[in-house]
Amino acid sequence: MAAMTAIALSLAPLVSASAAGGAPSMDANTDITDQTSLQSGARVFVNYCMGCHSMEFMRYSRMAQDIGLEEDVVAKNLMFNTDKIGDSMTIAMQADDASGWFGVAPPDLSVIARARGVDWLYSYLLTFYADSDPARPFGVNNLMFPDVGMPHVLWPLQGVQSYVKAERPADVDSEHIEQLEADDKGIRVRTAVTTKDGKTTHVLDMLEVTTPGTMQPGEFRKAVRDLVNFLDYAGEPAKLVRFEMGYWAIILLAVFAILARALYKDYWRDVH
């Protein structure tokens, strides 16, 4: 219980800050029964997220079993902080050091998908963009989480993304993002702009990759989807068992219904 409380408190700044602003989420379309996706997501998590974020409720051995990897493969490719397959996915970084470097200790991500939802996480990881404001400590901002304090750790894959805004009226009073939509060039940002006289116009902004990374936009979105899929699985591994049991339960009920129908017809054959 103490561990759950600590994680909930560590996630509180993320939840409250994102709730105060941001944009509507895009659909993540994850599927935790897709083992190939889970394996890809685990690889991205270990290589790009686990330098700062732990996942202490997940053990390497459980992960290997659930996502279809041999333990020796996990030990060779996904374990860098321990040599014991039964250990939890913790990190070497100390919370005090992290607070000094980032202003706040990066949260454990064991239940982040349950706290924020897969659609929000997917959209958040796709909408980092370069921000030259000196107040931005890592030179980036985020549409889902304005004034984010986290660096864009996936930039080697995505590249540097710029927020290209369409022309606005001169007397803008307020504006808000209505929809995000991914395409081959980047992410279309449909924005409603209200002027001081109360009139609202709609403009189309863009998030565009201006300095390419190692992946094309479609490839990067797939990598992010796989990562979010893995985070969704990690938040509740028992869902995999429930899904499998559910399939068998449906099959059993279907067979029972067929047998019950046949028995019913046999009982009433002479009556009719």
Sequence positions of predicted segments:
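Extracytoplasmic/secreted proteins, especially bacterial periplasmic and envelope-associated proteins
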Residues: T36, S40, V44, R116, ...
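Bacterial N-terminal signal peptides that target proteins for export
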Residues: M1-I7
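Juxtamembrane interface at the cytosolic side of transmembrane helices
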Residues: R242-H272
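Electrostatic cytochrome c docking/interface patches
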Residues: A17-R43, S54-Q65, G235-F243
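Short, aromatic-rich amphipathic segments at membrane interfaces
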Residues: E208-G246
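Electron-transfer interface patches adjacent to heme c in soluble/periplasmic c-type cytochromes
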Residues: G68-D183, D205-F220
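C-terminal segment of classical bacterial N-terminal signal peptides
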Residues: I7-A17
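The canonical Cys-X-X-Cys-His
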Residues: F45-E56, L227
